[in-house]
Amino acid sequence: QGFEAELAALPGDYGEPRGVLLLALVDGDVAGCCALRPIDDADYSNAAEMKRLYVRKAFRGFGLGRQLAEAVLEAGLRLGCASVLLDTLDDMEAARALYEELGFQEIPPYYHNPLPGAHYLKVELG
C-alpha cells in the first residue's frame, strides 16, 4: 500500500503543522511507531487518519502500542481534529481489540483498500 514510497518521503503528510510521527524508544532502540495525518477527502469534516501503529516483536506485551495510540489521539486533540479514522485487517486481532478499547467504531469504507478483510474505524475526539 505504498509503504516504500511513504518511507522515502518521511515525514511527508505526517509532518507539522497538521500531522505527527511518533517513535517509541527503549534504551535508545526504536521499539515502535505511530503516525497521524490529515485526511481531507473523507466524508468526515476535520478528520485525521492514524497510520503505521507498529511495535517490534521484542517490545510487545508491555502496553507500548496502547501508549503510542493514546499519544497520537492526544496529538489529534491538540491539532484540533474532530475525529480519527483508521483501517485495519481481520488478522490484526490485538490491534482491533485495542482500537475497540479506545472507543473506535466500525464505519463504512472511507477509501478503497485492495486487501481482503479490511475494516474501517473511527473515534470521535473531545
Residue ranges and their predicted role:
Residues 1-51, 56-57, 69-71, 75, ...:
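Acetyl-CoA-dependent GNAT
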Residues 28, 63, 80:
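Conserved G/P- and acidic residue-centered "switch" motifs that form tight phosphate/ATP-binding loops
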Residues 52-53, 61, 97:
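Hydrophobic alpha-helical segments, especially transmembrane helices
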Residues 56-58, 62, 90-91:
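Active-site acidic-Proline motif in GNAT/NAT acetyltransferases
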Residues 62, 66, 70:
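Residues forming the Rossmann-fold NAD(P)(H) cofactor-binding site
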Residues 82-102, 106-126:
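C-terminal "cap" of GNAT-fold acetyltransferases
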